[in-house]
């Protein structure tokens, strides 16, 4: 819902850099005011990271099961203003690493931007970066491995318990 970000920032006269492309770009450009800049797709990872590092905040108005871009922004120490549904509810800590807005409307996002401008966030850039590390690939692999080992141990114990019962029944 990039359209919400474009409309909210146009209404508030706030600078917004839109990175990426797609079939909606002509429509987005038509609704954009003079404070909206479109970079298109094809930027290198380093260029995108540079924008994350310089951004005051990152707007994530869509709803996704997880959504990697809020975590990427936080890995640069950038607070995230996200629609409070889906994966953003796990990756964004309201008032600390960013804010949630309640409805997917221009008004709700604009209110969230104004609250962020007024109140800021409690976490420093380094604390936001540290929070993003809790979503690392290494952590995921470690926790998945630990889970599998626990389940295997439980399963092994169940097999041992079952073999005991079967032996008694055979005797």
Task: Spell out what each predicted region is.
Residues 1-11, 23-26:
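A conserved mid-protein helix/loop that constitutes part of the nucleotide-sugar donor-binding site
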Residues 104, 122-170:
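A charged, aromatic-enriched C-terminal amphipathic alpha-helix characteristic of glycosyltransferases
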Residues 49, 71-75, 89-90, 96:
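Short alpha-helical segment that forms part of, or immediately flanks, the ligand-binding pocket
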Residues 26-46, 50:
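Nucleotide-activated donor-binding/catalytic signature segment of Leloir-type glycosyltransferases, i.e.
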Residues 53-65, 78:
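Acidic donor-binding loop of glycosyltransferase active sites
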Residues 79-83, 92:
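Short hydrophobic beta-strand element within catalytic cores of glycosyltransferases
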Residues 50-55, 144:
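Short alpha-helical donor nucleotide-sugar binding micro-motif in glycosyltransferases
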């Amino acid at each position: 819902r990039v359209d919400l970000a474009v409309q909210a920032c146009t209404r508030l006269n706030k600078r917004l850099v839109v990175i990426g492309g797609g079939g909606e770009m002509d429509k987005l450009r038509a609704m954009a005011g003079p404070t909206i800049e479109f970079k298109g797709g094809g930027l290198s990872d380093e260029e995108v990271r540079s924008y994350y590092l310089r951004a005051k905040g990152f707007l994530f108005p869509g709803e996704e099961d997880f959504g990697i871009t809020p975590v990427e922004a936080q890995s640069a120490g950038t607070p995230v203003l996200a629609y409070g549904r889906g994966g953003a509810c796990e990756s964004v800590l309201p008032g600390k690493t960013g804010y949630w807005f309640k409805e997917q409307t221009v008004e709700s996002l604009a209110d969230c931007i104004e609250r962020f401008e007024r109140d800021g966030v409690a976490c420093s850039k380094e604390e936001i970066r540290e929070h993003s590390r809790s979503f690392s690939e290494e952590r995921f692999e470690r926790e998945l491995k630990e889970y599998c080992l626990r389940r295997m141990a439980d399963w092994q114990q169940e097999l041992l318990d079952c073999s005991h019962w079967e032996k008694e029944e055979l005797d």
